Amino acid sequence: MSFRSVIISNPASLSVKNNNLIINNGEEFKIPTEDISVLVIESVAVKFTSRLLSDLSENSVATIICDEKHLPISTVLPLNVHYKTYKVLKMQFEQSVAYSKRIWQGITKQKIYNQGECLSILNLQGGEFLKKLSASVESGDKGNKEAIGAKYYFKALFGDKFTRGDGDVINSALNYGYTIARSAVARTLVMYGFNTTLGVHHCNEYNAFNLADDFMEPLRPIVDLWVYENIAEEDELTREHRVELVNLLNYQCIIDGKNHSILNAIDKMVSSYTTACSKKDFRLLKLPEIKPLEYHFYE
């Protein structure tokens, strides 16, 4: 399984040769493409061709392209990499409303629980309240517990004056981290043959990644935890911060009772969703649980 997250921050030319990504910035570096899960091109002075994007897509690499402010503006994903794409698409279309609501219930419960765990890890007030709130989530989140939890959570985490959507450094870091997580989830969904436009809950007709937006929800608190511990007292989002946010994919979380990297956990989550859909049993879905930040060492 691919495990590397690569970020290109300085002017360079990129190419692929003999199944290696070649990075040339005066010196030449080689990385096996089969090892790469996500490539982030931060500098607008990086040169590459459509052949590069084609080769990366063939190796199921999610390529994120940033603007002059180093903010992600585009994600390039592979198409038709699964050998039973039609079967999976048919399975998506045949999902009942009741089943989709149950899947969303599970996702929302885990997201709110992880928000509570984030507060508990940081010794902030409100962790137990959110965990109890997560247990009360109904099918389809009929009582809108997600919104109730989010309003409480962000105030407890970043203070009463914090507003999600402001242009401050905390929001910039959150948005950057969420985009990386979203791209990793979208990449894995595509690898398993899912059409990311067809969401379980998100259904924006202008959004090509509704399903990725559904399944990234339990991962958001991992980004929040990192941002609180590393950004809360900073004035700007530096290159070092962005590199670490990309590297979050190699930190640990818990899924199915075992420690895994976030990348591996995403794969297990999507794999379990495939099984849950094929057997029409929402209880088979496995979702990640956060833990104190710790790098995952691959064996």
Model-derived regions: residue spans:
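Glycine/small-residue-rich interface belts in oligomeric ring/scaffold proteins
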Residues: D35-K84
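Active-site helix-to-loop segments that bind/position phosphate- or nucleotide-bearing substrates
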Residues: S2-S5, P11-A12, G26, E58, ...
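N-terminal ordered "arm"
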Residues: I8-S50, S54
